[in-house]
Amino acid sequence: MRSTIKKPREADLRPLQLFFLAAAVFVVSAGYGALLPLLPAWLSRQIPGSTPSEVARHVGFLSGAYTAGVLIGAPIWGMISDRLGRTRILIFGLVGYVTSLLLLLLPSMGGLWTIYVLRATAGLFVAAVVPVVPALVAAHTPKAIRARRFAWLGAASLLGFLFGPGLNAVADALAAVFSNGVTLIALSTRIVIVLSALLGASMMLGLALTLPTHEGAAESDDNLAASAPAGFAALWWLSIAVNLVLSGFELGIVLQGRQHAELSTQQVALMFAECSLVMLAINALLFFTALLDKVSPRLVVAAGSLLALAGLSVLALHQTNEWMYIGVSLTSAGTGLVLPVISFLAAGASHRALGVTMGGLAAAGALGQTLGSTAGGWLFGAVERLSFAWLAAPLFAILILLVLRPSWWRATASRAALSPSH
């Protein structure tokens, strides 16, 4: 009688551990969303005599510096976490994130260039959080509930972005009470920085006290073979394309508001809130229905691409603001449907390569955002609202690849299915 040796079961995450992991994603997203709207007025005080166009240029460059930090750091931190342990890299990333925020309170150390360095540094340390959290969740989650947990992580990021303006409101209220002659915008910005740092420090402490220190059992050679890089190249290209579309689409909304008097600032803000809420609803749908476990990922990606195409078409041809809202909803729903599929399929990587896989996806997303902002700004300057139609090109490319190269997506999906669930 032949005996069989059962593979050791991977320890599942406890609810408190999962909470702190999702909260870490929430905090870094909220910190970015809270500080970004305050940068123009804050920089005006840091650069005496600057013109509005100069301030706007620096705001764009600072956002680019942050994104560049994520782009460079994500694959590096992912690779290091696979070797040294994901828990310690995650905590180290939060320590660096909190430190880079607090140092913003001392811009006199080097003026404007110090702010540039600190924003790039913040992006570099956030890059240690973005890929490592999903890698930890994938490594310690049975496949049967993995899709739901990744939907939860996506929701945490979106909620963090929505929470950013709320953090600003709290800061404004506190600044009004404690101003004592200090300019309100300067004090409000400092309070946002301190609150963001406190939230980051709280998550850092919670993760240090609750996360597992071991990385789980070693994998068999079959699982390692199932994580061949070629299959995940398709996911990286998909991440670049979808993030390019999403970034260009969001920038197009902002520029549309600036060039058309009938579209108020409040309406533009409402469209951004609509975008986040629709994507949050899509994540809730994936969470409660476990759709990714029941339907071919290839079909989900195709459906999301078609929805986004419809939304961009409406935005390119709209005649009234009401049609703009419809276009925003459709585009948000489509991109919001595709993005969780990418992370879910990437979770099928070998446990030993989860960090570098998720890091590659984070870098691909940052590259797509950078390309989308650049292309979106140039296109809108050239053809205005028809830029939305040109942004549909990457989505057409996705649909063509889904038809002409179905083996890419079947191979990637099979790798996710082969990842250990017990």
Which residue stretches match the model-derived regions?
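C-terminal membrane-cytosol helix-exit motif in multi-pass small-molecule transporters
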Residues: A197-A217, L401-S407
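Helix-to-loop junctions at the C-terminal end of transmembrane segments
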Residues: I72-G85, I282-S296
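Hydrophobic core of transmembrane alpha-helices in multi-pass small-molecule transporters
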Residues: F26, L112-A128, E322-L337
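Intracellular juxtamembrane helix-capping segments at the cytosolic ends
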Residues: A128-P142, L337-S350
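A late C-terminal transmembrane helix in Major Facilitator Superfamily
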Residues: R352-V383
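Short amphipathic helix-loop junctions that connect adjacent transmembrane helices
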Residues: P37-A56, L251-Q267
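C-terminal ends and interior cores of transmembrane alpha-helices
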Residues: V95-M109, L306-Q319
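C-terminal transmembrane helical hairpin of 12-TM major facilitator-type secondary transporters
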Residues: P297-I342
